Amino acid sequence: MNEKRLLFKDRHFTCSKIIGRRFACFAQRLSHRRKQSQCDLLNESTGQLPTTCSSAASNSINWNCRVKMTQQMQNLHLCQSKKHSAPSSPNAAKRLYRNLSEKLKGSHSSFDEAYFRTRTDRLSLRKTSVNFQGNEAMFEAVEQQDMDAVQILLYQYTPEELDLNTPNSEGLTPLDIAIMTNNVPIARILLRTGARESPHFVSLESRAMHLNTLVQEAQERVSELSAQVENEGFTLDNTEKEKQLKAWEWRYRLYRRMKTGFEHARAPEMPTNVCLMVTSSTSLTVSFQEPLSVNAAVVTRYKVEWSMSEDFSPLAGEIIMDNLQTLRCTITGLTMGQQYFVQVSAYNMKGWGPAQTTTPACASPSNWKDYDDREPRHKGQSEVLEGLLQQVRALHQHYSCRESTKLQTTGRKQSVSRSLKHLFHSSNKFVKTLKRGLYIAVIFYYKDNILVTNEDQVPIVEIDDSHTSSITQDFLWFTKLSCMWEDIRWLRQSIPISSSSSTVLQTRQKMLAATAQLQNLLGTHNLGRVYYEPIKDRHGNILIVTIREVEMLYSFFNGKWMQISKLQSQRKSLSTPEEPTALDILLITIQDILSYHKRSHQRLFPGLYLGYLKLCSSVDQIKVLVTQKLPNILCHVKIRENNNISREEWEWIQKLSGSESMESVDHTSDCPMQLFFYELQMAVKALLQQINIPLHQARNFRLYTQEVLEMGHNVSFLLLLPASDDVCTAPGQNNPYTPHSGFLNLPLQMFELVHFCSYREKFISLYCRLSAVVELDSLNTQQSLREAISDSEVAAAKQRHQQVLDFIQQIDEVWREMRWIMDALQYARYKQPVSGLPITKLIDPSDEQSLKKINSTSSSHIDCLPSPPPSPEMHRRKTVSDSQPCSDEEACSEVFLPTNSDYDSSDALSPRDLDLVYLSSHDIAQQTLSGLSGSAPDVLQVHDVKTPLGPGQDPQGEGPNPDHSCAEFLHSLTLTGFTPKNHAKTVSGGRPPLGFLGKRKPGKHPHYGGFSRHHRWLRIHSETQSLSLSEGIYTQHLSQACGLAQEPKEAKRAGPALDDPRGLTLAHAASLPEERNSSLQDARPSVRRLYVEPYAAAVVAQDEKPWASLSPPSGGRITLPSPTGPDVSQEGPTASPMSEILSSML
């Protein structure tokens, strides 16, 4: 029994000991975790690493907080962290622990205050830590020559966060290390981001001394660690010292490499291509490029010096360029008319190199307005409009206060009746289907998404269901509202609603009501910009479209987002009308509408441009020829980067436009005007090529010499004007030439709106606000004057109407000052005397070959065939057809013309529009059916070119081949159809419609190529953006007056033709259906080529020498596209009997 008790006591004692030890271990772990949590809290509150925790914890935290480093630097830092974290003695450890405990336990409030800091303080501490880590990581990447790491750091952090220009403990910046190790790529990247050299290196001696010190200290440290490693043997501490030794050896080699790079480097050479430009009346601009040799050291600075003496003694000033993102320097604050000499020198770590003078060596700050002391056109107009707007608002407030008491009772009665009406007629919904009326459609888009209603429709509200056929003036007034969407409510309140108001005033009131309704439904004031023309259909619907690009896909209460393609496919599957509605046309052409909206917001890069002023008039409006790529500016080519024209250049233009001949003007290489002359000459040729006008037809063209158009945003224009009779093409007037595809005829008012919205934003915003308000006031005062009965009412109405007329007069005066296009138009149409600089003084019309070699940037399709006589077949088809396709600029919004019943005068085709009406590919194929047996495809593209030898040509000759230029000219020749009125039609765009329309089927209407009526509108629109060619032999006509039976003498007087007979080979397009393509190749392998044969009579005499154009000067850089010719095929022409010549009417 006693033994059992003793055994039980032993077991009990053993268990209690075990429990006690486990409890002690648990308490120890709990205490350790508590200390660790306290350290973490202190670390988060102070932004520092804990120093009282265990060595392993300290090392792990420190390891995780640092960026990944190389093995040598990691070991070096690991040893240093252990050295600092390990206590020197147990007493020291206790003392550190006691101090930390007192800090943690002493004051709860102070700890809470330190821990619960504001979010901004903690974020700033974290940012400081990130900056420190990023700076060390940047040094690490530069030392290791890791280009990818440098780019990643510069991408993730800003230069301020990386602290690039703060020297490290060795007194070096990342740029210093990159330069002295001759790491050119990294040095260039750092220089572009704003990196600088260390401020300690004030001279060559200081840099050399600093490098010697770094090398010496690293060598001493390596020697010391090497001795310690050799003496101690294999111990744990010795292993750590070996790691430190490797790190210091690597750093010693780095410093030695930096010192060697500094010793071998030399000062840089002179900068190259140093050009001096006159940029204003008080400034000059110097542009240059890097030296050809930097002598093993990257250039970090440039110095620009200027003086009024040629020997630069004394200097008038200098600029040190540290920012090397652009090698361009503008010298401001100069004296107008004073001659300045400028030179540029480069700097690297070995000092400044020799200076290079500019080309030209000197220049005088000036502007073209200094020639006749002219005031600038754009000066003070915005301030005048701001004052007028304040007066108009004050006048509105005055009259609204006077008339508010009179309208209270009537207002109550009207509001009650209106509320009862709206109780049964809900007007807060979007329109689902269009009935005959006037509507507003809103397009909000983000990338490929468009805002639709809950019924998957474009948001549309009705303006009026009984509108007149012509809404041109109402539409132009509505476009002005796009600059004042936020004032719609104020405008509605300022207009009294009366049933006896005029029709125009009621339409304006309904437009404001519909706009306010759209704003309430969409929950936003900004509805975007108005599309340049309303969309009409044959049902009497007119759709005004506004477009806005949103920044993100935010939610709408009455709408949702949908893919544009999905919306188009749904509408196509749900709606198959016999005649499309305006909504159908909107959805079909929505990509063109969005493209126009995007491009109308884009501006040209700063520079001097040459623009082409060409207008056409219809019944009630004038249209301007612009490009589809940039519809807010005229057709143009760039002359040079400098937008300023100096006084000397403008004086040269004025002298040349007078009686002075070209031979009397000095064009030596030393003349400053020689470069400007060459740039202007090449710009004229490129612009004529772009608008597809041969040189011999541009004999009467001239430059606008009244002023230089300063558009804004450092964009200036010189204008190229046609002959006075061809500036504005009147209805029914024959147009002798047709431009390439990609052009647009924009109404004059809409062109001015989009132009000023891009280049004079503040002015056009103020003008539209004032003009819209004053037009409404004019209608209101006229209505009040008609309704006035007593003498006092008549006198008050007359007084207010006269105030409005005064406002209108002042606004019109300001508008005329800014409206440059009307001044240019009036000048261009003035016949006696002939004004301007004739281009024949710049280029010779006989120099046709040089123009053909210029590659046009606007279009790759060349079509300079003049209009032939009308075809009887076409005339017959014209008489039986009830409608015709519209022009390509109208096809994106109005797909077909209205009938006589609802025909609008604004829809009348201008002569330019008539030029663009063309026959479809089916009509061309029907005309060539007899010659080609129906095998001609719908679309052909040029693939290979072969120029057969003409009579008298030696195939073994080694001289220059004159056929090559003709091959380039005929490479992109397009065949177009012609209307009975002797006009051509060019296509715009290059989207083939074959895959979209499917296969053709025989139908009832042969004029529309077998399509049913509900497909006709779709085919017409699609064909305006496709090419049509047929196979056969074509004859190029010589001029607009040439016929097929013209005599050689008449042809010689009419204009030049091609020099020699040439042939052009055309292959089938890849877009043909496979079955048709294969059948053509198998059945008729010989009918695959198109030959162009000119007239036999030579027009230009062979003894005439072409006018030798000047070669580009040295140092001048002309920004023109390089000519690219087509690939010439070596295959000879086929031997098929195709001697008959088809007329170019095909």
UniProtKB/Swiss-Prot annotation:
UniProt-listed Pfam families? fn3
- What biological process terms from GO does the record include? behavioral fear response; equilibrioception; establishment of mitotic spindle orientation; locomotor rhythm; regulation of establishment of bipolar cell polarity
The protein's UniProt keywords, in alphabetical order, are:
ANK repeat, Repeat
Q: Pinpoint the Fibronectin type-III domain residues.
A: 270-366
ANK repeat segments = 133-162, 170-199
Q: Where is this region: Disordered?
A: 855-887, 945-964, 1106-1146
Show the coiled coil region(s).
none
User: Repeat as a keyword?
Assistant: yes
Bias regions of kind Polar residues — which residues?
A: 1131-1146
Extract one GO cellular component term from the record: spindle
Q: Region Highly conserved peptide sequence: list its residue ranges.
A: 607-614
| Keyword Repeat in annotation | yes
Q: What does this protein do?
A: May play a role in neuronal function.
Q: What is this protein called?
A: Ankyrin repeat and fibronectin type-III domain-containing protein 1
Upper classification of the organism: Eukaryota, Metazoa, Chordata, Craniata, Vertebrata
